[in-house]
Amino acid sequence: FIKADVAAPGVDIFSASVGQGTEGVYNTGTSMAAPHVSGIAAQVMQAHPDYTPAMVKAAIMNSADTDLTNNAGSKYAVDRMGSGFVNAKKAVNAKVLVYDEENPERVSLSFGVLEYPLDGEDHTVTRNIVVRNMDSVAHTYELSYQYGPEIPGSSPEVPPLVTVEPGETVKVPITFSTYTPFLEKTIDPTLEKEQTAMAYVNGQYQPI
């Protein structure tokens, strides 16, 4: 399945620290990002006390901003940013939730590992996502699929539109087709093809 779920502020974050008295400390990492997400989850729970943990997670993931790029303008792939960069206001105001039908607690849909022979045939698999409208008005969405990065030999298909009436839950089929002779591994454009491994030693990062 897909991880991470979301991206959050986690670089050079000033926070409280054990043993610092009234002072704080700057840190970087998931230890700084996780409290941001926890705070947003608390806000969603306060606004929607009837939401289950899976619904709170869906509200945060569905509302995340997807236009997250590096300094060169290349967009991060889903395995680096999840569903996007957390947006507290949008998460609190989320009244339409989208999640995987088979694994609603995961929210994101994954086709898993697809293993096919090199037989020159098309192979197709379909999974459903659920769109649940808890608003008092109907919502219509245009659907599309955005690669990150593009995978030669594959072809996703989604319906062009979906409409959910107030209080309605709709299943939307997501189809993924592969043509094995053309399949090719591609690299996230935000990553370098050659990278240096680093180790954290005595408070500093050092190349291995």
Enumerate the predicted regions with their spans.
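Catalytic-core environment of secreted peptidases
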Residues: 1-35
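Buried hydrophobic-core signal for structured, non-transmembrane domains
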Residues: 6, 82, 124-133, 174, ...
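Short, small-residue alpha-helix embedded
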Residues: 33-49
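An often Trp-containing, charged/polar helix-loop segment at the C-terminal end
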Residues: 48-77
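Short aromatic-acidic-glycine turn motif
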Residues: 68-70, 147-158
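Beta-sheet-dominated interaction scaffolds and their linkers
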Residues: 88-134, 158-164, 191-202
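Short acidic, flexible loop segments centered on an aromatic residue
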Residues: 134-152
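Intrinsically disordered, low-complexity Pro/Gly/Ser/Thr-rich segments with frequent PxxP/GP/PP motifs
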Residues: 154-200
